[in-house]
């Protein structure tokens, strides 16, 4: 068995210590705010299988840094809007925590849904299929 310098769980813990985490009930109340953009970073198959938060924008985890960087040929204009609050989510909150920590390192302000889509659904958040 290999020995890692830092485990994935430790990386998530470190990320969570430096990022803004939003609880499900709070994001439910923010859904209708036009200044809030919910970004789903799950794999497209997860979205198709489990559904998605209405109005969320899908951005695959592997492309986030490139879609946000205005100098990247892959840049998406949705990430260039001033005054918007971007809230990222995945299934459990691990990938989105790491994503938001990386984006903060890039100078991009964002938050993440603390417990992810699985808790969103359990706590009564609306889901589209």
Where are these regions (language model features)?
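Rhodanese-like catalytic fold shared by cysteine-dependent sulfurtransferases
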Residues: 1-36, 44-85, 94-129
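Active-site flanking residues adjacent to catalytic metal/cofactor-binding acidic residues
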Residues: 39
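Short, surface-exposed ligand- or partner-binding patches at beta-edge/loop junctions that are enriched
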Residues: 89
């Amino acid at each position: 068995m290999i020995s890692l310098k830092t485990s994935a769980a430790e990386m998530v813990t470190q990320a969570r210590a430096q990022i803004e985490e939003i609880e499900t009930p709070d994001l439910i109340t923010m859904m209708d705010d036009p200044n809030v953009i919910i970004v789903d970073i799950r794999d497209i198959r997860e979205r198709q299988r489990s559904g998605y938060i209405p109005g969320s924008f899908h951005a695959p985890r592997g492309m986030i840094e490139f879609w946000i960087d205005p100098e990247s040929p892959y840049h998406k204009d949705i990430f260039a809007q001033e005054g918007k609050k971007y809230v990222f989510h995945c299934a459990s909150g691990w990938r989105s925590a790491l994503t938001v920590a990386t984006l903060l390192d890039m100078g991009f302000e964002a938050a993440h849904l603390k417990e992810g889509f699985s808790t969103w659904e359990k706590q009564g958040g609306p889901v589209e299929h």
